[in-house]
Structure formats: structure tokens, C-alpha cells
């Protein structure tokens, strides 16, 4: 299913739809998501903007971000055979049966992009029989909604405690950080930090 995401009268930056995905996960080793962007008849939007794909957890109705990307400048993703590839195996428990997906592109023009999303369920020996996801923090409604570099962070609760059950065999932390926003401090050449900076740390205490 291809969706035109754009900004203006009668247009929308987001789309929510339900899909019937693979049912039996017993022999699924990994899941790959492919995000393809094509140019509308008027051409693609000229700017690189924040975009993501989310899946709804059916019990809590919470949205979990399964992939984030930055759109290319004024072109599509045809240089990539199937589009932008994202490994979404961590979200195996949410990508089975009938699922609700949300796509968002923070585009400010009526041109926008034609978006399609595809999944590959790769058969093999799963590393674990069961998967579980716990949200630590999520600030991804738009490009400026998150923790901005160099600015006051007192309004954010950045200390989180996670409890693990006795039957947990392995856990890992998944972070998606795009560094958007042109925030301070500037570098030695006077340029403000944006997606070009790699300034983040994660401290874990047992």
C-alpha cells in the first residue's frame, strides 16, 4: 500500500492503517523492514526531514517506534533496491497477525513523498522463543519534541529503572538518536550541533 504524505489542505503528514502480517513466529529468525520513498508527480520535497514508523501495542494502545530515518534531499530511495532497510527483529512480539502501523514524515510542502513499507520474515532458528519489549523513554512525536543538545533538560526524567524477571535470559538497550534541531553549543567553527554531532552517553548501573 502506497501512501502520499505531505502538508497542506486535504493532505496529512501521517497515516495509520491496519495490516495482516505473518502469523507463526516459531521458525522466524529475523524480521527486516523496508521503507521506500517515491516522488509524486510534482517531484519530491526538497528537504531532509524527520520521519518514523510506529506499531501499536494492542493491550496498552501505546505506540512503539520501530524505525526512524531522515528523508533524502529532493529525491526518492531508488538508489537502494528496496528502500531503507531496518532490522525490526526486536519487535517480533508486536509484528504478528493483525497490527496497526503509523507512518509520519515531518514535511512542510504539498509535494511530500509517496511512502510504502514492506516486511521480510526470514526463516531460520530463532535465538529465543519469546520476546518482550519495555519502553525506557520515547520522545519522537516530531523533530523538536526530544531532549535537545545543550539546552535545559530539567523537564525530562532521564533516570529510569527497569526490572527483569527471573526467566529473562538476555536483554539489550535499543536507542535511536537523530540529533535533530541545530541546538547549542556550537562547534569550533561556530556551527550549531545537529545531525552531525555524536554527543550522547548511556550509563547503566546494576
Predicted regions located by residue number:
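Extracellular/secretory-pathway and virion-surface proteins
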Residues: 1-206
